Amino acid sequence: MDFLDRPTMITMLEERMKQLYEHGNADVQRLDRELKQAPNDAEMWFDLGLAHNQCGLQYLEMAFERERLLFLEQHPDAEEEPNQELTVDVPEAYAMFNAALAAFDKVLELMPDYYGVQCQRGVALGNMHRYEEAEQCYLKALEEDEEDFSAAYYLGCTYRDMGDEERASRYFALADQLNPDSTGEIG
């Protein structure tokens, strides 16, 4: 079986990244078409926000892989893989997260009490390291539903990322209390 060389893999990955950035995934494309027919459908806007957020995460994953391949190409004798932290910002992924925020804001405009939108706004903000804003979204989600274990869990993640282990622990415990059967799968 023939394997692709690293330069070819990098080129293919860059092309996939370009396609994702320019066109989104199949869900984004479908929802964009459907929203032209039903521009006031809050549920579709919510789904579009989720799809844009997912595209941003996919783009970041590809950016990590691209950086790893570039490192290995430039350091063929390296004994270990590079650290999985990007050395530069990825504005394309941030654009996708901002598109998610715009969709979630449209949901709030159409239906201010739409369940789950504050938590998902927090996820998109957290993906951009805008932790203070994410924190406010999760707190608002918990005000709206004190049993929203996803909001409690993500608030714990936000506090952990902010370096506040005490509050992180408290909200992880709350999430576990709210959903003791959870296996760590948050949606």
Listing of model-derived features with the role each one plays in the protein:
Residues 34, 106-107, 140-141, 174-175:
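Canonical positions in the second alpha-helix
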Residues 37, 110, 144, 177-178:
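Structural marker of alpha-solenoid helical repeat scaffolds
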